[in-house]
């Protein structure tokens, strides 16, 4: 990989809302194309890039009181597969070879998740999209992202959000929220920083996995993270 890179292999977590654009639900082709463009900018740097996609544009399992949590979570996992397929299509349309691996087997449309195979794809310059979360209910897609980051030996876990970093509170709700430049894992958990859930945080903490939070919509933000120029 080029010498100017801060990280040579990363796991990028994309929330489902990246795929719905101006809409609150479903897949907006323009939004997906925009995400694909950002991803390709990073790929062109020579970084090995794996992606975990969320499913919040279709479903949020944790918010359905009237349904068994496991069932609700499985529905959410299936939502992530739709996002993964849309992103794969957008990337391949721009001539970037991409593989989708699902944690729940769907052999007709994607490879099953096989760690060694995923790593071989990355080494061959393909982008790998991990779908269906971790395959287990009660675990968020953020936790799945942290898990996959460890498994593939990523140098960092990059979480794309609607805001440009970690804040003391949700800046969308409270404009006085303060941006945090650096914070320890334990502080983040204890202060209830909502960037990741506690399970994802503690997985990263136990394995010394750096977490970088950034706003994907900002031009070059992903490239800046990878080159280490973004604070």
Task: Go through each PLM region and give its residues.
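C-terminal catalytic "cap/lid" subdomain
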Residues: 1-231
């Amino acid at each position: 990989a080029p010498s100017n890179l801060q990280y040579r292999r990363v796991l990028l977590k994309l929330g489902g809302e990246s795929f719905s654009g101006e809409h609150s639900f479903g897949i907006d082709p323009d939004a997906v194309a925009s995400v694909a463009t950002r991803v390709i900018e990073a790929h062109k740097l020579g970084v090995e890039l794996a992606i975990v996609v969320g499913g919040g544009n279709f479903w949020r399992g944790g918010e359905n009181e009237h349904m068994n949590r496991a069932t609700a979570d499985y529905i959410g996992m299936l939502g992530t597969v739709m996002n993964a397929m849309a992103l794969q299509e957008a990337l391949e349309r721009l001539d970037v070879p991409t593989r989708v691996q699902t944690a729940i087997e769907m052999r007709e449309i994607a490879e099953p998740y096989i760690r060694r195979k995923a790593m071989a794809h990355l080494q061959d310059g393909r982008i790998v999209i991990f779908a269906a979360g971790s395959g287990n209910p009660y675990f968020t897609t953020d936790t799945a992202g942290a898990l996959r980051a460890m498994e593939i030996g990523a140098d960092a876990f990059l979480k794309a959000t609607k805001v440009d970093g970690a804040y003391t509170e949700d800046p969308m709700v409270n404009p006085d929220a303060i941006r945090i430049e650096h914070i320890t894992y334990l502080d983040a958990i204890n202060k209830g920083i909502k960037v990741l859930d506690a399970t994802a945080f503690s997985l990263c903490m136990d394995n010394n996995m750096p977490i970088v939070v950034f706003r994907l919509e900002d031009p070059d933000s992903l490239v800046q993270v990878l080159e280490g120029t973004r604070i």
